[in-house]
Amino acid sequence: MKVALVVLALFGVSLAASIDNIEIPPSKNIYVEPINQPEVDPSLEIVNGQEVVPHSIPYQIFLVASAGETSWTCGGSLITKRYVLTAAHCIQGAKSVHVTLGAHNLAKHEASKVTVNGRSWVIHEKYDSTNIDNDIGVIQLERNLTLTRSIQLARLPSLRDVGINLEGRTATVSGWGLTNGIFQTTTDVLRANNTIISNKECNDVFKIVQPTEVCLSIAGGRSACSGDSGGPLVIDNVQHGIVSYGSSYCRSTPSVFTRVSSYLNWLQTHSEWRAQ
């Protein structure tokens, strides 16, 4: 199984957007080569996301991380007034992290938009970049945030949700990710709705899917794509997943998410969030 950690700038892709006139760095994504390569050109496959009503996903965050002269972007969610949930691969090796909240269009000035520095961040101690296991991390912000209509907390699973069967349920993934495999980005928050599939079906594609992960169907061509890494997967207003990996054939293979309910104890140890 071939795994590639990709920063889109390596392909010469320019993300023509900015946050308050500051150029947005490329996104950081994990691509896993499917066992059987789809018979489509990923550059032609547009992911059928829809623009959300502005600020209707108020826990959605946009992060920019840096290490030396290299910067990259990811998504995430606000889980307490001071902690952000994201994927481990989004903050691994970062020397600085900046989190933007209350945003809808990254390229426009919005009075609701707030950018806060990360004070510290931690990834799961058993994160495996080879098999993409335990792809979860948290960021402590430098200050507590004031909640507003545009900045709210994500609702995470309860202890009763541990081990529940999610197969067949409709889930929503959201973010500022690319609208196709490589070339087109968006400055507005998009969402895509689809159905959770079994890990067995997902493993027919990737062979590395674990019980601590959950997969989203690609029926109708709706899927998470490059740039959505770290963002939320929500079922009935509860965040059950974190965008982890997929293939560059966004519209032709499932997306894989870290299953949040598998890490409730870890989150309680490494953040202020408490399970109900």
Swiss-Prot record:
GO biological process terms on file: collagen catabolic process; digestion; proteolysis
Compartmental location: Secreted, Extracellular space
Expression tissues: Expressed in larval carcasses and gut, and adult gut.
Entry superkingdom: Eukaryota
Residues annotated as catalytic: 89, 135, 229
Chief localisation class: secreted
Catalytic activity of the protein: Preferential cleavage: Tyr-|-Xaa, Trp-|-Xaa, Phe-|-Xaa, Leu-|-Xaa
Propeptide segments, given as residue ranges: 17-45
EC category name: hydrolase
GO cellular component, one term: extracellular region
Keyword RNA-binding: no
Glycosylation site residues: 144, 193
Signal sequence, start to end: 1-16
One annotated GO molecular function: serine-type endopeptidase activity
EC number(s) on file: 3.4.21.1
Residue pairs linked by disulfide bridges in the UniProt entry: 74-90, 202-215, 225-250
Record Pfam families: Trypsin
InterPro entries on file: Peptidase_S1_PA, Peptidase_S1_PA_chymotrypsin, Peptidase_S1A, Trypsin_dom, TRYPSIN_HIS, TRYPSIN_SER
Peptidase S1 domain location: 46-272
Swiss-Prot/TrEMBL keywords: Collagen degradation, Digestion, Disulfide bond, Glycoprotein, Hydrolase, Protease, Secreted, Serine protease, Signal, Zymogen
Family: Belongs to the peptidase S1 family.
Role, per record: Serine protease with chymotryptic and collagenolytic activities.
Listed name of the protein: Chymotrypsin
Protein species of origin: Phaedon cochleariae (Mustard beetle)
